Amino acid sequence: MRIRIGIDVGSTHTDSVAIDERNEVIHAVKARTTADVTSGIVESLRKLISEGDINADDVTAVMFGTTHILNAIVQRRGLGKVGALRIGAPATKAIDPMLDWPGDLREAVGGLKAIVEGGHEYSGEEISPLNEDEVRKAAEVFRDSGVEAVAISSVFSIVNPEHELRAAEIVREVIPGIPIVMSHQISSMGLLERENATILNAASIKVMRKAIRSLRESLSSLGLEEVPMFFAQNDGTTAKANYIEKYPIFTVVAPISNSIRGAHVLTGIKDAIVVDTGGTTSNIGVLTQGYPREALEVEIGGVRTNIRSPDIVAIGLAGGSIVRVSGDDVKVGPVSVGYRLIEEGIAWGGDVLTATDVALAKGVMKIDDERCVPQRVKERVPAEVIEKAYAKMVEMLEEAIDKVKTSPEPATVILVGGGSLMWPRELKGAKEVIRPKYAQSANALGAATALVGGVVEKAFSYDHITRGEAIKQASEEAVRKAMDAGAAPGTIQVTEVEEIALPYLPGNAVKIRVKA
């Protein structure tokens, strides 16, 4: 038997699932998420192998959906010191790199920056030649300041990356062996957002290297040292560890994508609204052709970026959300007891009224835990408060669902996540509400079943290149990216080609997006 293991880290629990060649679930488990993330992953994996009676020799891949990078950025902890080099003077000097970043995050990544002459027009022609002397001087300053990675961004490098590539060569000459990230490798249109994502990626390399090293050691301790490691990406695809080590920013919101993708795997439905309810938040996203609908931009740790990421609405309403009653007013969330639910929830003998307590008392959910006694809630909380609180919870969810819809027509809603049991089977604006088997493990299942992929977004001017040649170039680059991420050459197909006119640029400009 060939087994794949998927592991996904949430704010409260770390889920693991083992699947066979037919994507059928063999076994699924939960473990507490830990502050360092890694030990929670190891415990979940150890539990899965033991309880599922899994032979290590049968495991062909372990796929991780991890919050290592998101936690590091949000907590400003463990990030590497970065030298940010922008190519685009004098046109881009009005706004410095990292200017609008939160001060503590800018300090955490070092705040070192330089702007040099160079860059390209949207057509790919030079604005001005790259000033190689300025690049070399900047690299020397970075070296003497002890930077641990360099982030290079250039105007319209997604059209012509020539200046970024040459600048990287010069930096390598000055600082041999230093990790270098170029913005054309990271994201798309929009210099500042692309630059931000590139700097965050460079700062995160140190964190991801440490995480991968730790996870490899953990796999070795479980007899899985020869098993390939993959990491789920923000767009619902996956990539090998050596690729993610270079581009860790591609994993920053992957757990959310895993749940949306897992909903598709569990139901076979390609187009739907997915509600993933955990212990702290509910994330509402959209399935489009079996993959998460993508957002145009995403804020990470207070910084605007334009990396590929799922388009979601997140609300502070989940299993651990605290319910507060003041007279006739009932407020649910956003504060949550999180993983302390089984200690602080009234049904478990605690003193905090939570959303789970309300759903238990309402009778819409049952929990197979002898310590959980719904009668405790009924005895301590008036029935009218339970009714009012539950109505408020449902109203909040329905409003969030409405925000992700693009038409007033009723949509299919799929409920997943550990907290999905607390929702009713009828919701306003939904033509059907589905909670599939293994809904609580949809996130790990999404990681386990993800395919290796590559996405490219490039700008072209049809005054300088034919449409067919532009699509061919973008498609070939997407295939190369998929191969770099670990896809077998003979298995790669171009699955999506999107062409968007750019009317704010002259010369019949377009953006072409290709997914392989």
Regions found by a protein language model. Give the residues of each.
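N-terminally biased helix-coil "hinge/interface" segments that flank
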Residues: 1-516
